[in-house]
Each structure stands twice: as C-alpha cells, then as structure tokens.
C-alpha cells in the first residue's frame, strides 16, 4: 500500500540529485525529501474523497531497513513516520473539524513490525493507530493469516482485509485464469467478517478478464453479506445459479444453464486443487489409486459439456459472453491438466522401459499444440477484442515467476 496519497512507483519518476524529493527512497538518509514528496501528494488530494495510507515499506515491497534489521528499530522508525504523516493529513485534509479515514496495511513486509516478535514489541496498541483502519492480509493464496483477537475487536479505526484472487510473487505467481473456487472465498471471508473485519475489504484481482465470476461474487458478498454471508452456508451454488441466469438467462434453457454451472464450478474446482502455474506432472500419480484416471474422467466430462454449450450458443449467435468469460478458461485449464497427466504417464512408463510411453508422449505433444491453438483463438476472437489476455505464462513454473517456464 502506498503512503499518503502518492504511488510508490511515482517516486522513481521524480527522484534525482537535483530533485526537491532527493534521490533515495529512504526515510533515514532522505527524511526531508521523503516528507516533501508525501506533503505534495496530500496537497493535490485536497477536495477529493481519499482514504490515505500511513506507514512505509522499502522499495519494491521490501523491508525498510533491510532483512537483517531489528524489529525494534523498524518499529521506532515507523512510529515517527506515522506521527509525521498524520500531522500532514490533519493539516491539509482535516480542516474545519472534518476527519478522513486512514489506513495502515499490515502486509507481509510489515507484519513483524505490527505484531512484534519474541521480546520485541510491535506497533500493536500504538496510540497513533487508534483511529486508523488496520488492513490485514491473507497469505496471498486466499487463506487467512491473522484475524483480530477479542481484546482488539473494538479498535476505533476498525479492520480491513486484503484478499487475493491473483498474485505476483513468491513462492509461485498465479495470474492466468480464475483459480479460486467460490466456497473458499465464502469460507475465508465469512470467517473474516465474524472476527470483526468489517470496515474495508480489498480484493487483488489482477486482470478483470477471466476473473469476472469470482470478482462478481466477492463484491456481492461484501455488498450484501446478509444474503450471501454467514447466515447462508452452502450458498455458493445458489449464487452461481443466479449469476448464470442473470448473465445468460435470456437465451438459455434451465437445462443449458445447469450445464454452464457444471462447467464453471468444475474448472474452478480443478484449478483450486492445484493452481495451473504450480501444476506439474508429479502432482497426480499416474498409477496409484487410479488418481490420474479419476481426474481424467472429470476432465473429459467437463470438456464435452463446455464444447456442447459453446456450440449451442454459437448456433444462436450468442457465444460471445460465454466464450470470453467461461469457455476459454475452462477449455485451456482442462487441456493443461490433461497435458500434465499424460506427461506423468509418459515419464512413469518410460522409466519402466514400456513402449506405451511413446503413445503418452505423443498425446502430451498434442495437448501442447492445443494450448497454443486455444491461445491463438482467444487472440483472434471478435477481431482481437481480448488480444493479449491469452499471453500470460501458465505452464511448468520453475521459479516464483514465469522465468524458465517449460512444457513438460
């Protein structure tokens, strides 16, 4: 989160040896320049509805004083920074007894500084944060890391949550298609609500394309929690039905909408078991307990339904929304999964010296080719309307990002 109404990346465009903001994103070495940078950011926000963030991180989401610095040193520095920032906010944005909401993001780089560690106290309980909303964060993969304890749930500034449907970072990024099932969102965010996190919900969605459905659900859960939240367990199926009817109801039958639901829930469930970017040919065993065969059966059923729905809608001239929001994601996800499953069979039987390994190797190559064909089809669809959205790397990640990704 970027402090006091200025974007962190903006500093790189205005820094320099002759800049009034100095040439170091470092509060210790360049205190006056950083304060000037923040002050000017607040000044230009006067008259606008803002939710300024207090605090500071190092460059590129790193720790301020380095990985080996003491928690106590960082906490001491953050206390000074937060106090200075609040003074600026009060001076420029809170005139005439007006108050503005303020936010402190307890993201992974600053968690230790908030909660403390060992004998070192953190910012928890710091009086200058009393009227500040504390934004907690999931583990980057849609699971809660920390929630308010009983003694702090009446915190004056309230609590918020930063949730991920898309992530760029360690240990493995996932930025291709939707891979978070609704029931996981429901489980985690209703727990969040029950623990008193009700002031602010933020969702990191990356590109909206391919995330339309889970994003829509997240926003509706936040907006109408009484209908979809804690008092409505097992309601994600009903929500899915409603969304499909709202989106496709004018030109589909009830049976066809049921098929769409099977496709939508099916591919999200499979992607939720193992996100595509972190999938490899050893995840599902090619022989033990018929694990591979059971997954392949699910893939075949889902694939047939997906193709059937597309052909029906195409015959009516109504395939556009289905293709771009569901068909491509489901088809490409299933194809990738089959690619890895058959690659696993190829490697198993090759190690055993069995000739059938060659057959599975050829099948794997067919799925690789199909992956390329699906991407090109998406790029060409509707005269290139969504061209570029198909380019996200998604196969065989060997690092946290797409460097050195590889086909099986």
Each language-model region and where it sits:
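Gly/Pro-rich turn-and-neighbor structural signature
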Residues: 31-156, 285, 289-322, 326, ...
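Aromatic- and acidic-residue-enriched carbohydrate-binding clefts of CAZyme catalytic domains
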Residues: 3-73, 157-168, 233-241, 246, ...
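Non-catalytic C-terminal accessory domains or segments of carbohydrate-active enzymes
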Residues: 392, 396-408
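Substrate-binding cleft of secreted/luminal carbohydrate-active enzymes
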Residues: 181-264, 343
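C-terminal non-catalytic alpha-helical accessory regions
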Residues: 239-397
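Flexible loop/turn segments at secondary-structure boundaries
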Residues: 5, 11-17, 21, 59-65, ...
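Short secondary-structure boundary/capping segments
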Residues: 2, 19-23, 68-75, 117-122, ...
């Amino acid at each position: 989160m970027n402090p006091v109404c200025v974007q962190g990346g903006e500093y790189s465009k205005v820094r320099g040896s002759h800049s009034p903001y100095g040439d170091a994103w470092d509060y210790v070495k360049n205190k006056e320049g950083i304060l000037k940078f923040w002050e000017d950011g607040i000044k230009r926000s006067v008259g606008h509805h803002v939710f300024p963030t207090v605090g500071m991180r190092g460059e590129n989401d790193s720790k301020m004083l380095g990985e080996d610095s003491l928690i106590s040193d960082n906490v001491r520095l953050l206390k000074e920074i937060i106090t200075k920032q609040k003074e600026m906010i009060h001076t420029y944005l809170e005139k005439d007894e007006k108050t503005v909401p303020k936010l402190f993001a307890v993201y992974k780089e600053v968690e230790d500084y908030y909660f403390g560690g060992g004998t070192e106290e953190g910012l928890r309980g710091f009086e200058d944060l009393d009227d500040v909303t504390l934004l907690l964060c999931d583990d980057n993969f849609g699971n809660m890391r920390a929630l308010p304890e009983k003694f702090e749930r009446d915190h004056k500034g309230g609590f918020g949550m930063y949730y991920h449907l898309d992530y760029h970072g360690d240990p493995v990024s996932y930025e291709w298609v939707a891979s978070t099932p609704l029931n996981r969102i429901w489980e985690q965010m209703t727990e969040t609500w029950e623990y008193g996190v009700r002031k602010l919900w933020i969702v990191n969605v990356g590109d909206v394309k391919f995330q339309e459905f889970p994003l829509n659900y997240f926003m509706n859960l936040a907006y109408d929690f009484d209908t979809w939240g804690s008092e409505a367990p097992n309601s994600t199926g009903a929500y899915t039905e409603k969304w499909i009817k709202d989106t496709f109801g004018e030109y589909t039958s009830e049976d066809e909408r049921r098929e769409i639901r099977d496709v939508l829930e099916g591919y999200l469930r499979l992607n939720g078991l193992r996100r595509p970017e972190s999938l490899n040919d050893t995840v599902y065993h090619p022989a033990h307990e018929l694990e591979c065969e059971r997954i392949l059966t699910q893939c075949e059923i889902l694939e047939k339904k997906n193709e059937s729905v597309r052909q029906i809608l195409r015959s009516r001239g109504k395939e556009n929304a289905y293709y771009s929001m569901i068909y491509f994601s489901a088809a490409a996800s299933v194809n990738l999964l089959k690619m890895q499953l058959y690659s696993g069979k190829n490697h198993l039987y090759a190690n055993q010296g069995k000739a059938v390994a060659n057959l599975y190797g050829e099948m794997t190559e067919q799925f690789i080719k199909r992956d390329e064909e699906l991407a090109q089809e998406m790029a060409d669809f509707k005269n290139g309307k969504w061209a570029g959205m198909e380019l996200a790397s998604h196969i065989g990640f060997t690092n946290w990002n797409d460097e050195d990704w590889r086909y099986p």
